[in-house]
């Protein structure tokens, strides 16, 4: 038999598909990250080992700021190429919506590297606006204000504009326009107004319904005309600088984007014809990420286009319609959150233990006085072959059901039930092995692989670190970071350490459609086994919750240079005391309460003084320890 190779693992986990040259496998069989194309590769297994020496335990979120920089450069170069190809004569701007990942180090890295690429920020709420105004110190950088707005939100934005910030207030509802007009008059400011238009066009994929007629935000054509009349009556006609549309996140089909662009471009033309000299067309989110590496519109976790194609269509559509109507090319703003941030973060956790369905030991002999159902089932297993497997499967199911029924009525004992159980699952395994080798296996056998998968219990919380996996069945690339020069010998689902049955991952990227198990290796007693989840830089950190009071994981920032990699920053995960404080438990008060109780227990002779001290010491150290298993 041919020896398993690294190339086999690359194909099995499709790392060349979703990795987009950032992720690969080295000669040691370890996953490597190459933040800069053709640059230094970071060995994730060696990185985890080094972090262990620094007392940074898994689970750990590893951020690669250089990937953020590379994504910004990629977007900018695509615009530059498209502008040259289609004769685009205006400016393009990239906007990062901080809702995608509001973590300060992420936002600051994007701002820092994005200065020379016309990169600005979008705020979708009052708290986000407070952050954006303070961290975005470049006066030439755009700030776009979306979301619901009250007077204090609008006043903050207008005063910031008055002091030199390049801020646009995007009207989502008609009442916001009236508030803007009122506050602008009070503050003596000529506001930069944008209007979000509700297109008939919608996106595709999981977020299809967030666009189109049923979308939450935006003005209809009738409301737009009302808004235009209002602005003209209030002397704000020249303040309308921008139109905005959004057809949904993670649009899987480029045709939907093309359709929306054509529709939106006509609004730009019509507004110019009515005397509103709009300068910016703000294309909302939608630029997707190929999570499964299939480049297919049939998968909600993929897209059938590249960044370059997305940009080409955006520029060519608006250039064409502008030239035909003799109006200036608009400045184009593209909102890119997922496409900028997804690749830069990797979650790594350790497998703690496994659970496998029982099986019959080949050397185990059936006792002469064994229950007749056990003997019958053993006979089925002993004589199983391809020709008989469908009949054997039906018989095995019937015998198992009969045995369970008899056990429930107290007729068969526990030992008999256990024997039936082991024989049944052994038969199921053998049937599955035979069926997997058949070109046309019976439909009844299709779900057996999923049924037989091991459970790998992992030191992480799905709800904290991968909320989209639980909430919307988002599929992320997942694979071991080591032993990839060995053939995986087990199939498993991943279980987290919360006490919730939903805390599991049972859908994985496969070479064909979606797999219900992950190929993994048997655990070794002397070697920790690590699994990584990739492309988690968008939304996951900020949406994560504290189910079972599991807090933020440890996080590290890793940069690369000519000589290798450097761990720039280590951010400790939350302690037990910190998460308890979130839910209004005072850690100091908890300790005092326990001290009183322990003192009472010692006086009553329930425990010794030393035991009391040991208990309190453990409690105090646990309070200020990691929320995950150590």
Regions found by a protein language model. Name each.
Residues 1-31:
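Charged, compositionally biased N-terminal leader segments and the immediate start
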Residues 7-9, 73-81, 104-109, 129-130, ...:
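Short alpha-helical segments and helix-capping/turn motifs at coil-helix boundaries
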Residues 20, 25-102:
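Low-complexity, highly charged intrinsically disordered N-terminal segments
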Residues 30, 38, 67, 101-103, ...:
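Short, glycine-/Ser/Thr-/acidic-enriched flexible segments
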Residues 58, 62, 84-89, 274-278, ...:
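Flexible, glycine/charged-enriched surface loops at secondary-structure junctions
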Residues 66-74, 226, 263, 313:
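A non-catalytic, amphipathic alpha-helix used as a structural packing/dimerization or gating element
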Residues 87-282, 287-289, 293, 304-309, ...:
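Active-site-proximal beta-alpha core segment in soluble small-molecule metabolic enzymes
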Residues 305, 313-315, 319-630:
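Charged (often Lys/Glu-rich) extended helix/loop segments that serve as interaction or gating elements
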């Amino acid at each position: 038999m041919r020896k398993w190779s690294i190339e086999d693992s690359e194909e099995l986990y499709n790392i060349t598909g979703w990795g987009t040259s950032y992720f690969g496998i080295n000669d040691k069989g370890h996953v490597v990250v190459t933040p800069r194309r053709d640059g230094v590769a970071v060995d994730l297994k060696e990185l985890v080992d080094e972090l262990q020496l620094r007392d940074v335990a898994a689970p750990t979120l590893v951020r690669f700021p250089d990937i953020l920089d590379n994504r910004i450069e990629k977007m900018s170069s695509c615009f530059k190429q498209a502008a040259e190809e289609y004769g685009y004569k205006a400016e393009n701007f990239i906007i990062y919506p901080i809702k995608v990942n509001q973590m300060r180090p992420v936002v600051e890295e994007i701002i820092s590297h994005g200065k020379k690429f016309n990169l600005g920020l979008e705020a979708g709420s009052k708290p986000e606006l407070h952050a954006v105004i303070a961290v975005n110190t470049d006066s030439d950088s755009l700030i776009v204000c979306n979301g619901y707005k009250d007077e204090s939100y609008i006043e903050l934005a207008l005063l910031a504009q008055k002091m030199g910030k390049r801020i646009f207030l995007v009207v989502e509802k008609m009442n916001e326009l009236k508030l803007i007009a009122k506050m602008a008059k009070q503050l003596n400011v000529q506001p930069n107004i944008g209007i979000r238009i509700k297109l008939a066009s919608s996106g595709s994929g999981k977020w299809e319904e967030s666009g189109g007629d049923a979308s939450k935000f935006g003005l209809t054509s009738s409301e737009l005309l009302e808004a235009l009349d209002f602005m003209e009556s209030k002397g704000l006609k020249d303040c309308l600088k921008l139109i905005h549309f959004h057809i949904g996140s993670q649009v899987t089909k480029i045709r939907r984007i093309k359709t929306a662009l054509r529709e939106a471009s006509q609004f730009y033309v019509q507004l110019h014809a009515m005397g509103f000299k709009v300068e910016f067309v703000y294309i909302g989110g939608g630029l997707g990420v190929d999570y499964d590496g299939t480049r297919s519109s049939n998968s909600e976790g993929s897209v059938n286009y590249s960044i370059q194609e997305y940009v080409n269509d955006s520029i060519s559509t608006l250039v064409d319609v502008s030239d035909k109507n003799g109006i200036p090319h608009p400045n184009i703003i593209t909102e890119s959150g997922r496409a900028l941030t997804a690749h830069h973060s990797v979650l790594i956790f350790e497998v703690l233990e496994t659970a496998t369905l029982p099986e019959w030991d080949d050397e185990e002999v059936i006792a002469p006085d064994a229950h007749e159902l056990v003997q019958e089932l053993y006979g089925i297993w002993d004589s199983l072959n391809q020709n008989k497997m469908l009949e054997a499967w039906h018989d095995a199911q019937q015998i198992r059901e009969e045995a369970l029924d008899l056990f429930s009525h107290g007729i068969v004992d526990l030992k008999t039930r256990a024997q039936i159980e082991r024989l049944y699952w052994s038969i199921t395994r053998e049937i599955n092995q035979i069926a997997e080798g058949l070109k046309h296996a019976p439909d009844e056998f299709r779900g057996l692989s999923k049924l037989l998968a091991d459970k790998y219990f992992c030191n992480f919380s799905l709800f904290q670190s991968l909320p989209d996996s639980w909430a919307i069945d988002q599929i992320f690339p997942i694979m071991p970071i080591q032993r990839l020069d060995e053939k995986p010998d087990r199939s498993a689902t991943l279980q987290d350490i919360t006490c919730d049955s939903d805390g599991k991952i049972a859908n994985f990227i496969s070479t064909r459609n979606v797999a219900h198990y992950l190929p993994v290796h048997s655990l070794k007693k002397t070697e920790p086994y690590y699994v990584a989840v990739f492309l988690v830089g968008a939304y996951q950190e900020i949406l994560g919750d504290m189910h079972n009071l599991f807090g933020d994981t440890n996080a590290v920032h890793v940069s690369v240079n000519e000589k290798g990699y450097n761990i720039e920053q280590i951010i400790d995960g939350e302690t037990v005391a910190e998460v308890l404080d979130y839910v209004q438990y005072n850690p100091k008060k908890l300790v005092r309460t326990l001290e009183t109780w322990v003192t009472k227990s010692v006086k009553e002779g329930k425990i010794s003084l030393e035991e009391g001290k040991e208990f309190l010491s453990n409690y105090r150290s646990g309070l200020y320890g990691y929320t995950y298993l150590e």
